[in-house]
């Protein structure tokens, strides 16, 4: 009856007041963590697809989605949950993994509610969902080999700072080794995930004057 009267009087619920009372915002924060130095480069198209799916899923469950681009925040829990702006956090991307995982450890310690899309590693704090980078790269490399490619270059950072790229590189190397092809480390160039960085990495590869017939 109260809700009916409220509708008749065109009364709108103050969401801020309601969330303070219930201690729930009915909002999820989606934080896109950009690589350092990517500047104003275009968003990873894969993330745009993920964004659409997440938006639809939250709306279907009666939640709002708060989207933010992140680079330098030191306390995401204070920024969103403690500030009563969101009930939980979804992370897309992570920049430098070594720095990112330290922040995830802190979020776990303070009891934050979060989930990450990215690498799935043993002992990693929190809950993470990701791709099978090793086998995906292995199958992709086998496809290139089946096309007759033998001198395949690999663009991407394969250090501990980018575990997903490292997994892809390991799968890539396995496919080459099974085909009897020696992995040439000089055909690997570190690069971040943007078109501009890929372009720069390819120029760097060309400057090495090494023969290659495909780029992974």
Model-identified regions with their sequence ranges:
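Short beta-strands and strand-loop turn motifs
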Residues: 117-118, 152-156
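Alpha-helical recognition/docking segments in bacterial nutrient-uptake
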Residues: 23-142, 146, 205-207, 211
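Alpha-helical structural signal in soluble globular domains
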Residues: 5, 53-57, 106, 167-179, ...
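N-terminal helix-turn-helix DNA-binding module of bacterial transcription factors
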Residues: 1-26
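Conserved beta-strand elements of the Class I
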Residues: 29, 153-155, 213-216
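Short, intrinsically disordered, charge-balanced linker/junction segments flanking boundaries
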Residues: 1-3, 189, 206-216
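Hydrophobic alpha-helical segments within soluble ligand-binding/sensing domains
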Residues: 129-154, 170, 174, 195-204
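Short beta-strand elements in bilobed, periplasmic/extracellular small-molecule ligand-binding domains
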Residues: 58-69, 153, 169, 173-197
């Amino acid at each position: 009856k109260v809700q009916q009267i409220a509708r008749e009087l065109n009364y709108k619920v103050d969401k801020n007041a309601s969330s303070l009372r219930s201690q729930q915002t009915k909002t999820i924060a989606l934080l896109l963590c950009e690589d350092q130095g990517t500047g104003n480069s275009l968003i990873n198209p894969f993330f745009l697809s993920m964004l659409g799916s997440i938006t639809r899923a939250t709306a279907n469950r009666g939640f709002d989605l708060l989207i933010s681009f992140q680079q330098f925040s030191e306390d995401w829990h204070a920024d969103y949950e403690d500030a009563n702006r969101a009930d939980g956090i979804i992370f897309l991307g992570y920049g430098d993994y070594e720095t990112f995982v330290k922040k995830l450890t802190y979020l776990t310690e303070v009891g934050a509610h979060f989930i990450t899309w990215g690498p799935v590693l043993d002992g990693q704090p929190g809950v993470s969902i990701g791709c099978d980078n090793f086998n995906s790269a292995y199958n992709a490399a086998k496809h290139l080999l089946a096309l007759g490619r033998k001198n395949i270059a690999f663009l991407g950072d394969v250090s501990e700072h980018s575990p997903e790229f490292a997994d892809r590189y390991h799968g890539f190397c396995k496919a080459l080794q099974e085909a009897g092809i020696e992995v040439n480390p000089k055909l690997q160039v570190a690069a971040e995930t943007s078109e501009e960085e890929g372009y720069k990495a390819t120029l760097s590869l060309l400057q090495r004057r090494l023969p290659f017939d495909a780029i992974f």
